[in-house]
A protein has these predicted regions:
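Interfacial transmembrane-helix boundary/kink motif in multi-pass membrane proteins
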Residues: 1-19, 45-49, 70-102, 161, ...
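Membrane-interface capping segments at transmembrane-helix boundaries
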Residues: 67-74, 248-262
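Hydrophobic alpha-helical transmembrane segments
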Residues: 7-15, 52, 86-91, 133-137, ...
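Hydrophobic core of alpha-helical transmembrane segments in multi-pass integral membrane proteins
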Residues: 14-22, 55-65, 93-103, 235-254
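Functionally important transmembrane alpha-helices
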Residues: 18, 22-30, 173, 178, ...
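Juxtamembrane helix-loop-helix connectors linking adjacent transmembrane helices
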Residues: 37-46, 73-143
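Alpha-helical transmembrane segments in multi-pass membrane proteins
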Residues: 15-69
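Membrane-interface helix/loop boundary segments of multi-pass membrane proteins
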Residues: 146-171, 198-205
Length: 262
């Protein structure tokens, strides 16, 4: 009976995120347009403030749910926040972004995926109406927090209750990828989910997967706003980070094996 409950949690949590986020978007839009009578053009220009508010509510809601679900696990061993693991998490995020860049370059050459790449690029450009501050607050800060609480803190942890760690990481990462609703984005989001899931499984500290996500989205944002000369340097940097990212992940896996054998 307990396993059935944990089996339902990932599905219900993802559905709740989908429904709540869409409901909040609808309510904010109606409040601004119908109650405050702000002109649509002005609303669109500053709509990122509404999105930031929505993400703040989502973070509060899902962090509360996360705490309620796992309040009995509060005493479990976890890695305290430290400079070495913070830096390692950022390196993993940068390296995943490097792999993502290679994947996108390949996808651009495949006729069957070109429309998906175009849709993904258009969606990225439309975040916060193209406003740099809004994009940073939404895509770089807020989205990593709420999505990691949801997919690592709730979905992955629930799956640990009825499936092996490797299967839980893989399935939760695929769900994370599919949730992006774009085949090109889903592929590298799944890869990022696996890396973030490994760090969370070994460290039991949500900050580390959040930092992986943060680093990945930060690079994506910088590439969208930086001039071409700077973009070339960013591309070289994230490609160089692939090897160190692999090292950090392998080290985490080895540390986990040593801990299990003790």
């Amino acid at each position: 009976m307990m396993k059935k409950r944990y089996f339902a949690i990932p599905i219900l949590a993802i559905a709740l995120h989908f429904l709540l986020s869409n409901l909040l978007y609808f309510l904010v839009e109606r409040l601004v347009l119908d109650v405050f009578h702000i002109p649509p053009q002005q609303f669109m220009k500053h709509s990122y403030w509404g999105e930031i508010l929505i993400y703040a509510v989502l973070i509060l809601a899902f962090f509360t749910l996360y705490k309620l679900l796992w309040r009995k696990d509060i005493s479990e061993p976890r890695t305290a926040t430290n400079f070495k693991d913070v830096l390692g998490s950022l390196v993993v995020g940068f390296g995943i972004c490097g792999i993502s860049g290679l994947w996108i370059m390949l996808a651009e050459q495949l006729p069957s995926l070109q429309k998906s790449v175009e849709a993904m690029n258009a969606g990225t450009e439309n975040i916060a109406g193209g406003n740099a501050f809004g994009t940073f607050m939404i895509a770089v800060i807020a989205a990593p927090i709420v999505e990691e609480i949801l997919f690592r803190g709730i979905v992955l942890r629930s799956m640990w209750k009825f499936a092996p760690a490797w299967a839980s990481i893989l399935i939760s990462s695929v769900l994370f990828g599919v949730y992006h609703l774009n085949i090109v984005q889903a592929a590298y989001a799944t890869l990022m989910g696996i890396a973030a899931g490994i760090l969370y499984e070994k460290k039991r500290n949500l900050l580390f997967p959040i930092l992986v996500h943060f680093a990945n989205n930060l690079i994506t944002m910088l590439q969208g706003f930086a001039p071409s000369e700077v973009n070339e340097l960013i591309s070289i940097f994230i490609l160089i980070m692939i090897a160190p990212a692999g090292y950090v992940i392998c080290r985490s896996l080895r540390q986990g094996k040593r801990a299990d054998s003790m």
